[in-house]
Amino acid sequence: MKKSIKRLPKCTQEELTVLLDLVCKSIGNCQMVILFGSYARGNYVLWDSNIEFGVHTSYQSDYDILLVVTGQTKYVERKLNRITNKYHDLFADRRHAFPQFVVEHINTVNRNLEISQYFFTDIVKEGIMLYN
C-alpha cells in the first residue's frame, strides 16, 4: 500500500488533509483511513464537461475513503454526515471533490483479507494509507 499523496494535485492534497483532520478530530475509534479508487490509482478526473444533445453535463471523480474503526460503525456514520457538511462548507468557494466513505470494523476488514475478498485485497494493492 502506498503512503504518500504527493503525486496528487495540490488542491487535492489540501482537501484530503482537511478531511483527514476532521475525521481524526471527530472519530476517536478510527484506526485507519485509506484512500482507494480512482484517486489512489491515478486515473481520477478533476473536472470534465460536455454538451451532448444540447444538454450540458459535467463529471468529476469523488474521494473513495475507507475508515477502519473499532466499536459501532453506525455511530461513526452519523458523525461522517457532519464531517462531510463541514468539509463542503470549508470549500464552498471552489469546485471540490465529494468524499464517499465506507466504514468497516477492523475485525470485518481482517476477516475479508484472510479470505482474499476482492474489494479489500484491491484496496491493499492500490490504496493510499492516509492514517494508521
Regions found by a protein language model. Give the residues of each.
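Catalytic core of pol beta-like nucleotidyltransferases
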Residues: M1-I34, S38-Y59, V69-N132
